[in-house]
Regions:
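Transmembrane-helix motifs of polytopic, lipid-linked glycan transferases
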Residues: 126, 130-151
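Transmembrane alpha-helical segments
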Residues: 217, 428-461
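Membrane-interface transmembrane helices that cradle and orient dolichyl/undecaprenyl
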Residues: 149-151, 188-206, 214, 326-327, ...
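Aromatic/acidic, Gly/Pro-rich catalytic loop(s) in extracytoplasmic/lumenal soluble domains
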Residues: 2-7, 515-634
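Short periplasmic/luminal acceptor-recognition loop of GT-C membrane glycosyltransferases, typified by
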Residues: 99, 448-452, 456-514, 520-537, ...
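Transmembrane alpha-helix segments characteristic
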Residues: 50-55, 159, 320-321, 328-349, ...
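Short acidic/glycine- and proline-prone juxtamembrane loop motifs at membrane-interface regions
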Residues: 169-182, 354
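Transmembrane-lumen/periplasm boundary regions of multi-pass, lipid-linked membrane glycan transferases
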Residues: 84, 225-329, 351
Length: 634
């Protein structure tokens, strides 16, 4: 006879005792002590940042929406794509064709979701620029930290921060809602982690992660990957280098690889009939995109772009490039100087040069310009310690653990064995005088050139025509006519309930699915709200060009910068409502009296959606093979 085992005789695990109530308080005290210790270690830098950041915040925050004006559609495009993500659960408001990874406008969408930006801010672009302001403050802290990790003294790291922020060239591009600003912030974070004095596996993993985030924001930042890897190698610890590089590459490739997996999951990895593809987009970006000419050709677009940079600020980038050449001999600054020279060299290739290209050059130019002054100014040899170089009162290492930090310090101190003391003193005094003269001369020159430009940035509202045009259109145009506009106003009109949905003028000609809703071409267009594009753009959008030719101006803003036009088919007058102005004998059906459009403008979105509410999807995204060129795009 079998017996049932007596389970009560078995040894059971003891129940986990609840943590005492004081456990949370102990953890909080430990965290507070850790923060306090870090603050004490970096007290000098924290005080300096507490002085510099408010200055940067005022200069970048005052009138950030007014200057620059709405000079490129790219800002509106990224805001519209963020709106599409937030309200339509789509990657883009039209077909996403892999022009850029979508991490940049995903971050904009997260910000606008958390802050109700699209309904709170004056315009959609304003909400996106708010995020650029916050990201710039983060970038300033990261730039300062990177300078300190690369051996710059506090004064020169702060100097790099100031020129990086106060340059009119920086103000122009860092205020605008460009993906480059997001990518640069993540890039600086990756460099800070790579140069971490801890040399830990976690720091390497963070460096790879932030580099991947930078790629997801702007794919061109992958050009900085070799420099990041070299910096990580320079600051390596031989004891864990194998694990460091594995974690760095694993995080980088794993997160970047999600982009390829996304395309593969949607069957859009390779080119095929009836759909976009990542392969086609990469090939177009690298090989098929029309070049903008040589920088040496005064009639080329590349020359005009570089000329516009120098008109804003002829000093920062050129000074950084000039300083980068001798800094190649200094190991601790070799990576940033080589990366700046690499970016400078790319300008001379016969390819496409986007306007915001200079954005990624600015932090490296600032570090090189300040780094050369730091290298020339003699410094005292650091006190030796058991941790490869010791620390100063700010908790920073003087050496870098690369076998060359002490040699750099000796060279920069100006000392040398066998030299007479009077010779060393004279050489030291000469170097100090040269640095002092350079700093004073730079302050005078930059103040003379930058002050009126910064004053303009703080006072001129160059965006008013665009905002006024949108307000006037919403207040005075109440019929359900189809409006063709730029992407700057697209989101604002959509948020305020304009139905049928407005159409971005580029899509009217270049997207076959959108063009299919305009069987009579320009005669199916009722309103235009945009400035006159240049002739080179009009050549790509003939339907828009014809609509402009057959239109009359209802209202003009900013001396013709933005015009609201009514398109008049043959036999129609401006006083006749669009519903009674058909395109001809074979006109489209008249619109119903309840405001629902029989002819939708974009094939998606419910025409009767209320003001400020997202339009409901009414089908699959538009599909096409051809890419859409975005003016001034990156």
């Amino acid at each position: 006879m079998t017996t049932v085992p007596d389970v009560f005789d078995e040894t059971l695990p003891h129940p986990v005792a609840p943590r005492p109530a004081a456990w949370a308080a102990d953890r909080a005290r430990l965290l507070g002590a850790w923060v306090a210790a870090g603050a004490r270690a970096h007290r000098s830098s924290l005080v300096l940042l507490a002085v510099l950041l408010p200055v940067v915040a005022v200069v970048h925050g005052v009138n950030f929406d007014g200057w620059p004006g709405r000079v490129t559609d790219d800002e509106g495009t990224y805001a519209a794509q963020a709106y599409s993500m937030q309200y339509w659960n789509r990657i883009a408001h039209y077909t996403y064709w892999y022009d850029h990874p979508f991490g940049g406008w995903l971050l904009i969408a997260i910000y606008t979701k958390l802050t109700d930006g699209f309904h709170r801010a004056a315009t959609a672009v304003t909400a996106a620029r708010e995020l650029m302001f916050l990201l710039h403050l983060v970038s300033c802290v990261l730039l300062y930290r990177l300078g300190r990790l690369l051996g710059l003294r506090r004064f020169f790291a702060g100097l790099a921060l100031l020129v990086f922020s106060l340059s009119p060239l920086a103000l122009w591009y860092q205020r605008m809602a460009f993906l480059d600003n997001i990518g640069v912030m993540w890039l600086l974070a990756a460099f800070v982690c790579a140069a971490s004095p801890r040399r830990s596996v976690a720091a390497a993993a963070l460096a790879g992660t932030f580099m991947a985030f930078s790629f997801w924001s702007k794919e061109t930042t992958l050009l900085f990957l070799p420099g990041l890897y070299v910096l990580l190698w320079q600051h390596r610890d031989p004891r864990n280098w194998r694990f460091v590089r594995r974690n760095f590459l694993g995080c980088l490739l794993g997160i970047c690889g999600i982009y390829i997996l996304y395309a593969a999951a949607k069957n859009e990895l390779f080119e095929g009939p009836g759909h976009v593809s990542l392969e086609w987009a990469v090939r177009w970006q690298l090989f098929d995109r029309a070049p903008s000419g040589s920088v040496l050709d005064t009639g080329s677009d590349t020359y005009n772009v570089v000329r516009s940079w120098l008109d804003l600020d002829p000093y920062l980038v050129l000074a950084g490039i000039a300083a980068a050449v001798p800094l190649l001999a200094l190991r601790r600054l070799r990576v940033v100087s080589a990366l700046l020279l690499m970016q400078f060299g790319f300008i001379f290739r016969n390819g496409y040069l986007p306007n915001p290209y200079v954005t990624a050059m600015l932090p490296f130019a600032a570090l090189c310009a300040a780094g050369l002054l730091d290298a020339v100014l003699p410094r005292a040899l650091p006190r030796m310690s058991t941790d490869h170089g010791g620390r100063d009162g700010d908790g920073e290492r003087h050496g870098h653990g690369d076998g060359d930090g002490h040699g750099d310090a000796v060279r920069e101190r100006g000392g040398g064995r066998g030299m007479p003391e009077w010779t060393t003193a004279a050489w030291t005094g000469l170097r100090r005088g040269a640095v002092a003269a350079a700093v004073v001369g730079s302050v005078v020159t930059l103040a003379w050139d930058w002050t009126p430009k910064i004053h303009k940035a703080l006072t001129l509202d160059a965006s008013a025509p665009s905002r006024d045009a949108t307000r006037w259109f919403l207040a005075h145009i109440h019929d359900d006519g189809t409006v063709i506009t730029d992407d700057i106003a697209w989101t604002d009109l959509t948020i305020h309930g304009r139905r049928p949905l407005p159409v971005w003028f580029y899509k009217l000609d270049l997207d076959p699915e959108v063009r299919g809703h305009f069987p009579h071409g320009w005669k199916d267009v009722d309103y235009l709200m945009m400035g006159k594009p240049p002739d080179s753009v009009l050549a790509e959008v003939p339907i828009v060009a014809e609509a402009l030719h057959h239109s009359v101006v209802l209202k003009s803003f900013g001396n013709g910068e933005i015009e609201i036009r009514r398109v008049l088919p043959p036999g129609c007058r401006v006083d006749i409502p669009p519903a009674r102005c058909g395109p001809g004998p074979d006109s489209v059906p008249a619109r119903s009296g309840d405001g629902d459009a029989q002819r939708p403008a974009s094939g998606r979105g419910h025409p009767g959606a209320g003001a400020g509410e997202p339009a409901r999807d009414s089908g699959d995204p538009l599909r096409r093979r051809d890419g859409v060129l975005s003016p001034g795009g990156g």
